[in-house]
């Protein structure tokens, strides 16, 4: 509780919902005729995916995958696959939905996995794009971005602090991080 009471609110729920509407509009314009397979990146992408899907007005197949570098810590390690996709996406367009593009190691590995497994095109949607110069690859950027964010440790709307506060109704920055 102390983490939340001392945190700075960067985006409130209304701002986040407006950003999700903006992302949905862009995805509808780009993918409505492409019959995509949509992958929710667990656990962080769960809330964003759940809020976004009802706003997508076209048929799609939904599945999930779980790859992480954090394992409830505040800094990342090696990529660990907890669950690889179980649905076929060979010769299909894929949309990967995740909570945040930070350095991009996890998202980059998921993109590579989908491309090597036969996806026609791979698109990415993130709720948050963290603003810094430490991206894993210079060309790595999300196709659909909800909100930019300062380079601080954040939580809420799916993002956690040591496994907690994914349920926070906004995006908050940890004091001192």
Question: Language-model segments: which ranges?
Answer:
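PRPP-associated nucleotide enzymes
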Residues: 1-177
């Amino acid at each position: 509780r102390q983490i939340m009471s001392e945190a700075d609110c960067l985006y409130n729920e209304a701002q986040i919902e407006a950003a999700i509407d903006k992302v949905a509009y862009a995805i509808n314009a780009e993918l409505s005729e492409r019959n995509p397979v949509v992958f929710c990146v667990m656990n962080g992408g769960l809330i964003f995916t759940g809020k976004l899907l009802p706003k997508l007005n076209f048929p799609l197949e939904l599945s999930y995958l779980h790859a992480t570098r954090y394992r409830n810590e505040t800094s990342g390690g090696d990529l660990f696959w907890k669950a690889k996709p179980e649905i076929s996406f060979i010769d299909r367009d894929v949309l990967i939905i995740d909570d945040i593009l930070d350095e991009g190691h996890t998202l980059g590995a998921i993109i590579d996995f989908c491309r090597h497994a036969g996806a026609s095109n791979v698109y990415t949607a993130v709720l948050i794009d963290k603003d810094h110069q430490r991206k894993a690859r210079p060309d790595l950027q999300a196709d659909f971005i909800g909100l930019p964010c300062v380079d601080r440790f954040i939580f809420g709307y799916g993002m956690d602090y040591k496994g907690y506060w994914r349920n926070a109704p906004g995006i908050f920055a940890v004091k001192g991080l």
